[in-house]
Amino acid sequence: QVYWRHPGEYGKEDVLICHVSNFHPPDITITLLKNGE
């Protein structure tokens, strides 16, 4: 699940929060990409 910390406003920075649960094995690496990069 990915969501914004605050309501987005075009042209302004914000923080994306990624929440992963019930994933096994518990040690994983998650990478967020913009346009596949």
Curated annotation (Swiss-Prot):
Keywords: Immunity, Immunoglobulin domain, MHC I, Secreted. It is found in: Secreted. Heterodimer of an alpha chain and a beta chain. Beta-2-microglobulin is the beta-chain of major histocompatibility complex class I molecules. The keyword Secreted applies. Belongs to the beta-2-microglobulin family. Pfam families: C1-set. The keyword Hydrolase does not apply. Disulfide bonds: none annotated. GO terms for cellular component: extracellular region; MHC class I protein complex. Component of the class I major histocompatibility complex (MHC). Involved in the presentation of peptide antigens to the immune system. Residues 11-37 form the Ig-like C1-type domain. This is Beta-2-microglobulin. InterPro entries: Ig-like_dom_sf, Ig-like_fold, Ig_C1-set. One of its GO terms (biological process) is antigen processing and presentation of peptide antigen via MHC class I. SUPFAM superfamilies: Immunoglobulin.
